């Protein structure tokens, strides 16, 4: 007997008779062979008829997976004609991008504009789009080539099978589609490509809770920057960047470097600058912000207070346990826009934004090729090309120089063959990494980061020419006399409390990201099934007159209602696909940003355990031994002590005491640094609030659009005949 009930053998024997019965609603597939199989049952609703074998290796899922792989590899770029390749690039540039491929909306437009019958459209869709297999990544070049080949075969009256495509491999047909012709005409005339048809119903009156301003759609924000979901705002050109003082030592190439602690002042000064942008262009503009150059020290300076006020300066917020920035600093945001005109509840100041675009061409010798990324900063007015290894080198340098800072995370490196889905995920990870750097008040002022974002030459060449410093940020700094007393005595307990909460929260957010990815993929699969349903209904209208041939008077009204249902299913498919895309580019990236933030804080505490150690107790014991030895040497009769031995012991004592002072000062600096990082991390809670507000508004908008779509269908099918 099994731990969870009847064993598989007993269950199979006990249910064999039940499986052999012919049931009208026998939806369950046959799992047996011979007498135990219901192969002979004429089940009207047995949808999984492919499961004709009891072997688990012959399941329907495995067959679909195998066919999907065949479709992807049947027509490679070398086999496809140039017209197929140009058509794919044309559709991709039109903006209907899902993952690294094209979406179902473009597939529907190509099929509907080809002039083939609805039944042929349905058959082609079922061949090319294999249900939930990789649906979230769109159609790649391989699937698109097969799609065009099947459309061409249908227009020539050939069989619609993969074998027919393979037989015509050397002479593939040239399909005709009004949609592709329109895209080509727009490209030749230089006019913008027509946006994909999104069924937009008349908006409802805005409720009092909604914000007065509404953002543009995500797709509109993507088209200007090669469909990058992190589209950089077009900032003003006259931005005056902060000038670095020339009396500081030159580090990391050229220019002068302010101390890491003073860098907080200029950064927070920018964030606190009043935002005087109108609501209409708030998401696409930037205000000039002059960094403050006060004479204060450390975090206190960044808050506009002197260290004499103690701690972080001024009156601390009660919610931060005696240290924290004023409320004006809490508006750190990422003003990304939601699709389909979702309004924002609040309009925080626009911050610097960096876009990362994957370049299509590989570089390097065979077997050692690599991908390049275009890194563009609108505020800095810079565009550079970097490799993934350049990002790795930058993070390695920052870990050596700023081990006790909240360093952003890099996406992992993949050694196996690159896939479009992986490359797109890594590109988005690089976007999060780069923008986390430019948001950080200290790391954004580091010369390595500035040079990484602005040096136009190849980074490996610049590294050979520049003088790069990766010394610990506390090296050479003197401890201010009042800094140690200004730190709260409960700081260690606060560190442990925050560390425990961050560890648990990071695990939860990792799980949330996985769940939301699954939800988005399910939405993509649901959209594909809606399109299949729509094409099946359209093909049904072709045979309705023959089906009811005795009296065809009501057939036109019947077909009109069926076509209305098919059209509204197509509208629903577009909405589902657009919503899934909005999730992947919006709330999913927001969750991943918060996840990366939590994991980076967790790793900061782990690095503190490894690198914040000292040997002060050992030095104190050694000083005591040397002092006793020195007294013994001085008490000896003159002439019995070797020359220079007393001076040697004295020098050892002095060096040990200096080392104790330096290590103690470093420990204080580490406490202050981690305290500052926790205060900076405190702002992420407001990002969580915006995340939930924007996602809820987005869900409401799509729910209203779907409801309006089905309400319109209900009105249109009222005229369908109900009786003779």
Curated annotation (Swiss-Prot):
GO molecular function: phosphatidylinositol-3-phosphate binding
Binding-site residues, a 1,2-diacyl-sn-glycero-3-phospho-(1D-myo-inositol-3-phosphate): 387, 389, 413, 426
PX domain segment(s): 351-459
Pfam families noted in UniProt: PX, Snx8_BAR_dom
Top-level lineage group: Eukaryota
GO biological process: protein targeting to vacuole; retrograde transport, endosome to Golgi
Domain remarks: The PX domain binds phosphatidylinositol 3-phosphate which is necessary for peripheral membrane localization.
Job description of the protein: Required for vacuolar protein sorting.
Protein's name in the database: Sorting nexin mvp1
Gene that specifies this protein: mvp1
